[in-house]
């Protein structure tokens, strides 16, 4: 696994699932990036709502905690796989330390950019999205296993 494959994780996170599917060939790294990016976008939405619409925080915290509990095993597996890819691309311990910082930083930057995009929406639009967040988190569009079933099939072919 090379560094460009790892970079595709951060790149794929910046793209919506449909855009990523249209622009990038299916591969383990790309699919991992899509699914992990979906998780990061959920975190960004929660952060944006907490910042811009604090009145929704209590309801969103409760709903988000339930959503995270539902996805805990999947998210832990994704995090393990991202870390394993970074380790495989590293030449030694020092290289791994540099790489982990670089790629985790890229992932956080993509999440921040998505959060900032959400914060740039009109106040009413964002307020409405934040108000509907508890309901949205229980819907099929928030079920990572359902939304990313094809990508997860590719990912799970590897141990």
Annotated model-derived regions:
Residues 21-62:
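Immediate post-signal-peptide N-terminus of mature secreted/exported proteins
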Residues 2, 16-18:
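Short, intrinsically disordered low-complexity segments enriched in Ser/Thr with adjacent Pro
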Residues 64-159:
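Compact alpha-helical subdomains of small soluble proteins
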Residues 8-16:
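Bacterial N-terminal signal peptides
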Residues 1-9:
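Bacterial N-terminal signal peptides that target proteins for export
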């Amino acid at each position: 696994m090379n560094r460009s494959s790892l970079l595709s994780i951060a790149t794929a996170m910046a793209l919506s699932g449909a855009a990523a599917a249209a622009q990038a060939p299916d591969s383990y790294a790309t699919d991992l990036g899509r699914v992990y990016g979906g998780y990061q976008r959920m975190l960004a939405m929660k952060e944006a709502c907490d910042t811009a619409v604090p009145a929704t925080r209590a309801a969103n915290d409760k709903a988000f905690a339930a959503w995270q509990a539902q996805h805990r095993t999947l998210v832990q597996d994704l995090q393990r796989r991202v870390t394993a890819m970074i380790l495989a691309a590293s030449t030694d311990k020092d290289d791994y330390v540099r790489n982990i910082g670089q790629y985790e930083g890229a992932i956080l930057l993509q999440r921040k950019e998505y959060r900032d995009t959400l914060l740039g929406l009109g106040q009413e639009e964002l307020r409405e999205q934040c108000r509907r967040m508890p309901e949205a988190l229980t819907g099929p569009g928030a079920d990572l296993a359902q939304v990313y079933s094809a990508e997860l099939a590719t990912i799970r072919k590897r141990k």
